[in-house]
Design a protein with these regions (language model features):
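Conserved nucleotide-state-sensing and coupling region of NTP-binding domains
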Residues: 100-155
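Walker A/P-loop
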Residues: 61-81
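ATPase catalytic-site recognition across NTP-hydrolyzing enzymes
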Residues: 257-336
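N-terminal accessory segments
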Residues: 1-62, 322-332
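Conserved RecA-like ASCE ATPase "motif II neighborhood" in helicase/translocase motors
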Residues: 138-198
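ASCE P-loop NTPase helicase motor core
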Residues: 183-258
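A short acidic (Asp/Glu
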Residues: 76-79, 108-112, 223-230
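Walker A/P-loop NTP-binding motif
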Residues: 78-91
Length: 336
C-alpha cells in the first residue's frame, strides 16, 4: 500500500512522537503503513481497505461479517485491527480475544504475527513501549496491560473460558470454513450450530463491554455459514428491515468490470488468473475464490465446465447475430 496520507495537524503544537501517534490512530491503513510497512507499502490501498478499517474500529458494531476475495488482505487487516486495539485501548480496558481458524495451527500462525511485532518491531516498541506480558506461548499470550489472546480451531471448546472474570471481548472466525469441513450437510450444520451454541454464548455481555464476533472469509459452499449470513443480509436489505450482522461483501471484479484492488489485482492479472482456472476446467473455482460465488455444480442448469469463452464483441447486423473480433465474425444461432 502507498505512502501515508498527510493530515491537518498543527506541527507547532505537538511533538514528533505525538504527530506519528495521531496519524496512526486515524485508520488501520495509516497504522499499518507506519508500523507494519512490510505488509502495507507493497501496493496502494483501495477504497475497501478504508471501508473495512471503519467497520473494525467501530465499537458499536458487534457482529461483523467480512466476505472478500482470496488474497485481498482481509486477515492482515483483522490482525492490524487487533494490534491497534491492544496498543490504543484506554487504560483499564482489557481484551480477551480468540482467533479461530479451520485448524488451530492456522490460528497459531496469525497470533504469532502479532507476537512477532509486539516483541521485535522497533517502531511499535519505541512509540508504545514493551507490551509483552507474563504468558508468551505459541497458543496464547498476554500483554503488560492485562489483555489475553488465544488461538483456537473450528469446533473447539470456547465456553467456560475467562480472563480475570472477563469473557471473550472479541472472537475472530477467520477462514473457519473450507471445502473440507463443509463437504457434507452434517458438517455444515455442525459448524452453524457451533457458531450459535458455542461461540455466541462465550462472549462478554456486561453493559458497555459487550463482546463482538468478526466473521472473515471467502464463501466456499453455497450452504456455508457465511453464505447463510449473506443471504439473510440481502433479504433484509431488500425488505428494508434491520439485520443482526453488519455485512461487507465484495468481488475482485464486479459485473461492470470494475476491479476491487486495481493496484494489486489489475484487470489483466485477474484475467490471467481466470484463464489458468479455465485451462484446467475449473472456471467455477475462480468464481468461488475471487467472486465469492460458490456454485452447486451437480444441480446447476448450466454447467461451467461446458462453457466456452470468446474474446469477441456481440454484434447484430441484418437481423443476424455475430461474435466479432479483428480476425473473424462467428454467426450466433439462438434457439428458444
Amino acid at each position: 500500500m502507498s505512502e501515508v496520507n498527510s493530515f491537518n495537524i498543527n506541527k507547532n503544537n505537538v511533538s514528533q512522537k505525538e504527530r506519528v501517534l495521531e496519524l496512526a490512530k486515524r485508520d488501520l491503513v495509516s497504522f499499518g503503513q507506519l508500523f507494519l510497512p512490510g505488509d502495507y507499502m507493497k501496493s496502494s490501498p483501495a477504497a475497501y481497505h478504508y471501508e473495512l478499517s471503519n467497520l473494525l474500529l467501530d465499537s458499536t458494531k458487534k457482529r461483523n461479517c467480512i466476505i472478500l476475495p482470496r488474497g485481498h488482505s482481509k486477515s492482515t487487516l483483522a490482525k492490524t485491527a487487533l494490534l491497534y486495539h491492544l496498543y490504543f485501548n484506554p487504560e483499564g480496558k482489557k481484551e480477551f480475544i480468540a482467533w479461530v481458524a479451520e485448524e488451530q495451527s492456522q490460528a497459531i500462525d496469525h497470533i504469532k504475527y502479532m507476537q512477532n511485532h509486539i516483541e521485535i518491531n522497533p517502531a511499535l516498541n519505541y512509540y508504545f513501549g514493551d507490551l509483552r506480558g507474563s504468558k508468551w506461548t505459541e497458543k496464547e499470550f498476554t500483554t503488560s496491560k492485562g489483555d489475553r489472546v488465544i488461538a483456537k480451531g473450528t469446533s473447539q471448546r470456547l465456553r467456560g473460558r475467562s480472563q480475570l472474570g472477563l469473557r471473550y471481548t472479541k472472537i475472530i472466525l477467520d477462514d473457519f470454513e473450507s471445502e473440507l469441513n463443509t463437504k457434507t450437510p452434517d458438517r455444515r450444520r455442525e459448524i452453524k450450530e457451533w457458531v450459535m451454541s458455542t461461540v455466541e454464548p462465550a462472549l462478554e455481555n456486561s453493559a458497555g463491554n459487550e463482546g463482538s464476533i468478526w466473521l472473515i472469509g471467502t464463501i466456499v459452499h453455497y450452504d456455508s455459514f457465511l453464505q447463510s449470513i449473506y443471504d439473510g443480509y440481502t433479504e433484509a436489505t431488500r425488505d428494508e428491515r434491520r439485520y443482526a450482522w453488519d455485512v461487507m461483501y465484495h468481488k475482485a471484479i464486479d459485473g461492470d468490470g470494475n476491479v476491487l484492488w486495481s493496484s494489486y489485482f489489475s484487470k489483466q492479472k485477474l484475467a490471467d488468473i481466470r484463464r489458468r482456472f479455465e485451462d484446467v476446467g475449473l472456471a467455477h473455482k475462480f468464481a468461488q475464490e475471487y467472486l465469492n460465488e460458490a456454485r452447486d455444480l451437480e444441480n446447476a442448469k448450466f454447467k461451467t465446465d461446458r462453457l466456452e469463452y470468446y474474446d469477441h464483441e456481440f454484434e447484430s447486423k441484418n437481423n443476424y447475430a455475430y461474435l466479432v473480433n479483428s480476425k473473424e465474425a462467428i454467426p450466433v444461432n439462438i434457439y428458444i
